[in-house]
Amino acid sequence: MAAQPPTGIRLSALCPKFLHTNSTSHTWPFSAVAELIDNAYDPDVNAKQIWIDKTVISDHICLTFTDNGNGMTADKLHKMLSFGFSDKVTMNGHVPVGLYGNGFKSGSMRLGKDAMVFTKNGETMSVGFLSQTYLEVIKAEHVVVPIVTFNKHRQMINLTESKASLAAILEHSLFSTEQKLLAELNAIMGKKGTRIIIWNLRSYKNATEFDFEKDKYDIRIPEDLDETAGRKGYKKQERMDQIAPESDYSLRAYCSILYLKPRMQIIIRGQKVKTQLVSKSLAYIERDVYRPKFLTRTVRITFGFNCRNKDHYGIMMYHKNRLIKAYEKVGCQLKANNMGVGVVGIIECNFLKPTHNKQDFDYTNEYRLTILALGEKLNDYWNEMKVKKNAEYPVNLPVEDIQKRPDQTWVQCDACLKWRKLPDGIDQLPEKWYCSNNPDPQFRNCEVPEEPEDEDLVHPTYEKTYKKTSKERFRIRQPEILPRILPQINPELLYQTSVSSQSFSPVKESVPRPHLSEVTSPFAARIINLNLASPASEPENSSMKRKLGVHSSILNAKTRRLSNPPVENSSYKNDDDEDVIILEENSTPKPAVDLEVKSDIEVKSEQSHTEQSGIHVDLVSSPKPCVQASSTSTSTSRSDPGITVSTQTDAPGLTVKKEESMEEDMGVRNGTATLSCVGTEAKVQETSAESVDATSHQLQELRSELLVVTQERDDYKRQCQMFTDQIQVLQQRLLEMNDKCVKKEKCHQSTETDAVFLLDSVNGQAESLDHLGSQYQQALQEIERLKRQCSALQQVKSECSQASCTESKSEVDEMAVQLDDVFRQLDKCTIERDQYKNEVQLLEIEKSHIHSQCEELQTEVEQLKSTGQQAAADGSTASNAEEPVSYVDGESLKLRSLRVNVGQLLAMIVPDLDLQQVNYDVDVVDEILGQVVEQMSEISST
């Protein structure tokens, strides 16, 4: 029956089976261990160290977790053993990891069936018992947690509750007496701390799920036994097709990366875990910035290469300084092409929500967008580093195989737990490192705060030149794609017909719009855009044409619908250097009233505009018309007596001739580019006077656009002239260098092209394309020959300079090496001196402490002697002889126990002292103590 409060409304019951059900959220055992580590890390406990060990108690293998944090009161321990109580808050910038008040229950019950918690906070000491075995034995219907509380003098508080809880603990736990419980409390060093003991560990094939034998300083997950392949390493479920990193099966490796910036030391089986600043222990470190739309701030992403193992790569995703997902592959790393190998990314996703086992994030839209953005950022970093490093190391090794070292070396002080940056070249560090060992005098004191990090969250630390060059390369290679994709375009995608309403013609008119940009070569013209017009989709006062870009000129004409295979453009059929981008817009039918005026005026205006800009347009009718459209469309158009728009289209050739004259000193002749397009005819019966204003407005816009294009063409001409002058200056300098370095060679041969060029220029004849091509090839050959001569001269010059400077360089190098050795020895001596100073200081402190203890013991011995003598004197004068004897015996017993303690203390100071041969009933120990005190006083005075 569930408990009933005074109001009579029942409380919800919690079945003991829920302890096991709740623990199944941890499919990976190390995630349960991490929950217990998080409890010691959180700011309410704020432990500096946590010890994780394996021990045996009453023939049971146990896991122990001991920390030196703030401990807990009995009430706080009760909330910890209950469900959903979490009052953790941020303290001094330390953000808690725990969110749900469920970590200890799920983690401890995942590792074993029974757990005991020992804690003390300086005032009280408490013992709590959470056990599935105990609840099964007593057949409990609710979760029951016995808790015993002691005061500083080891006396129980709240006797009624504590006695019942103590009886349950002594009967059903590994500790059968109260003294054993107090001994575990004494195992907590210091006045505050917590100790957790877990037993009845989860088993797998008649053994625990942990391997304690392979590495005596680690806790590992054993290898899987495969019947066909033998033993194979453990892998997490999501990494079955990948190389498993060591953190998947080694608790020591997992704890080293568990926190983005560790604030606590973790000691596993007696050996400290070498925690690392994950974002600082990479090579070729660069930072990028992620600007999500669902956040008002930016997020920093750190990229770098793994220096230890290139097969361990991916994104390390942290939440509030705690690792959630490790080595998550994104972007190009998901492809089987060895891209992104060795690249590690670090991001702190405080804006995402982790699952309650803290091993994944909720699969929300924000998470998907973040993963997508991480993939793009990683691709940028990979492409940039691949180009940069392959240029720096021109060898056959890819960038992921180049030997790398971390960009920076950081170490954590064992006293203040602050992170300090070390200079380059320090490889070996002592087992315990303190701020006083820092070569940098600015950070040689534990009181000095940590070195500030780069807080620029707006700009990346590297320029993405690869992306810029890729865009530029695509822009340059754009003309190469047009001839290849133009024959493959399905005409049904370009020319689609639609059925209109009864009051409109069943036709959509398409208008091809070839945009002629500036001609970058005298042998080719370039098509930029091909659009389908939408006459009815825009207001009447606006132009039917799309706004032109700054770099293009326009040539538009009205066409009728083509319903059969597309017209092939022979001028681009064999051109491999050009490109076209086809943009298709759906158009809606419109009454044909406006079409005649608009089409006629557009053709005329474009002809006049092109004549002004130097472009000649000739309309040449094709001898063969295009294939007729379907009879259905034709008959439908004829059924309307008021409006008739024919769907039959002819294919006249529209020849565009553009001639540009370049300056004579450039050596470039006039080139002719011919472009054939689809001509159009629009037959209409009525015209509208209202469309004249709209057409004039269109003409005005076209004139302004043509003026802009003409101005830009003139600008490009001026730039071309400037670049030509620069090329001539460079060629002149190159010739002067050749004249200085080699003897002049006279060539009595003349080239035929020069003569032909002069003859044609005199006669006013234009050169053919073949002549221009041959001249261009000869110019290229001449440039290559000059380049080879220049490189040969440079090589000769460099060899001469190397031969003269080799001896001097060798001497300078030897001196530099010697000087470097001297500085290294000096640094080493300085470090050793500081270490010795620290050891001397520690020894002096220990010596003074021992001296004070000796003095206290000596005074106590003297007091006991005086009381003993006084008691003996009083006993001799008393009438009854038996009572003083017993009193003296009690004093002598205290004196003997005190001498035993003094003897143990003296054995630590005097190693040669054999306590087994010492008689504690006489004053031998007192004399030895006096001698040691005299020697210590003499040493301190000297």
UniProtKB/Swiss-Prot annotation:
Q: Where is this region: Nuclear matrix binding?
A: 326-353
On this chain, the residues bearing Phosphoserine are S517, S543, S563, S768
Q: InterPro entries annotated for this entry? A: HATPase_C_sf (IPR036890), MORC_ATPase (IPR045261), Morc_S5 (IPR041006), Znf_CW (IPR011124)
The record's section on Pfam families has:
HATPase_c_3 (PF13589), Morc6_S5 (PF17942), zf-CW (PF07496)
Q: Which residues cross the membrane?
A: none
What is the recorded post-translational modification? Sumoylation is involved in interaction with PML and localization to PML nuclear bodies.
Where is it localised? Nucleus, Nucleoplasm; Nucleus matrix; Nucleus, PML body; Chromosome
Q: What happens when the gene is disrupted?
A: Lethality occurs at birth or within a day thereafter, for unknown reasons. Embryos at 14.5 dpc are morphologically indistinguishable from wild type. MORC3 deletion leads to increased osteoblast differentiation and altered osteoblastic gene expression through up-regulation of IFN-beta/STAT1 signaling pathway.
Where does this protein have coiled-coil stretches?
696-874
What name does UniProt use for this protein? MORC family CW-type zinc finger protein 3
Q: Which organism is it from?
A: Mus musculus (Mouse)
Protein's gene: Morc3
